[in-house]
Each structure stands twice: as structure tokens, then as C-alpha cells.
């Protein structure tokens, strides 16, 4: 597998740094830029190409959902994965309906580390912890 470039959209510097350190464990994943807002991410993508956008559900200037909608409209072939601090099947379902290829919980580092390569291979990935919640109907919808 070639090295895949990632744009991380995350406004919490401490979490972004921790995620960068964790992703450095996989030589096939390279975070090429960190954007602290949705607008910064859009500006970056106007100038540069990446293989994957990993975006926070909550950003200071717009919601992650609003950014995801813009990304899907402007870059429909660009895979996006949503990160969230909330265990919410409703949020996950909404993100996936809008085109996200993954929904991962921030406090599940192993899930993030395992999920990103799967998303890059074209799979849909939802954190195991999130899939274990809710009814079987909701779980089926997420799969």
C-alpha cells in the first residue's frame, strides 16, 4: 500500500497532536496538514490534494456535518471520515447518509488506527463501541 495523505480537521490542538503521534505508528498514513476550522480545510483543499479528510464533528466556524456537505458537493470522490467525542447513533447515521465513509469515536484510538486504512480501501467503518449501542435495526442501518 502506498502512503495515503490525510487532512485532519480538528480545532483541539492537544487531540490533534495525540492523533498525529498515534497515526505515525502506521507508515502508510501521513497527515499532511491540520486545519483548525472548516474554512481552513476548504482553503487547503482548493490548493492541495489529499486521499482522505478526517474531520471533527464539532468545529468552531461550522458543524462537521456542514463541512461534510460542502466537501461532498465540491469533492464527491474524496473520502471523508467523521470523528466525534459523542457516542451517538443519530450523529453517525446522519454523517453516513451525507457521504462520510466512517464515523469514529475520539476516545477509541485503536478503532481510529484500524478504521482509517479500511476507509481508504473503500470500506465503511463505524467504531465498534458505537455499533454495540442501540437496536439491531440501527446497527443494520450503519453497516
Question: Which residues make up each language-model segment?
Answer:
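Conserved acidic carboxylate
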Residues: 10
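The feature encodes the CheY-like receiver
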Residues: 60
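Short, flexible helix-to-coil linker/hinge segments that flank and couple to helix-turn-helix
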Residues: 92-97, 107-143
Amino acid at each position: 500500500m502506498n502512503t495515503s495523505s490525510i487532512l485532519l480537521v480538528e480545532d483541539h490542538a492537544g487531540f490533534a497532536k495525540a492523533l498525529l503521534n498515534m497515526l505515525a505508528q502506521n507508515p502508510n498514513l501521513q497527515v499532511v496538514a491540520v486545519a483548525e476550522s472548516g474554512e481552513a480545510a476548504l482553503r487547503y483543499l482548493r490548493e492541495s490534494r489529499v486521499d482522505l479528510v478526517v474531520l471533527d464533528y464539532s468545529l468552531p466556524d461550522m458543524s462537521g456535518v456542514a463541512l461534510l456537505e460542502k466537501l461532498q458537493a465540491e469533492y464527491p470522490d474524496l473520502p471523508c471520515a467523521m470523528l466525534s467525542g459523542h457516542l451517538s447513533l443519530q450523529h453517525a447515521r446522519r454523517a453516513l447518509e451525507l457521504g462520510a465513509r466512517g464515523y469514529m469515536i475520539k476516545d477509541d484510538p485503536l478503532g481510529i488506527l484500524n478504521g482509517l486504512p479500511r476507509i481508504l480501501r473503500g470500506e465503511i467503518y463505524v467504531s465498534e463501541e458505537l455499533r454495540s449501542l442501540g437496536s439491531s435495526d440501527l446497527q443494520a442501518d450503519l453497516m
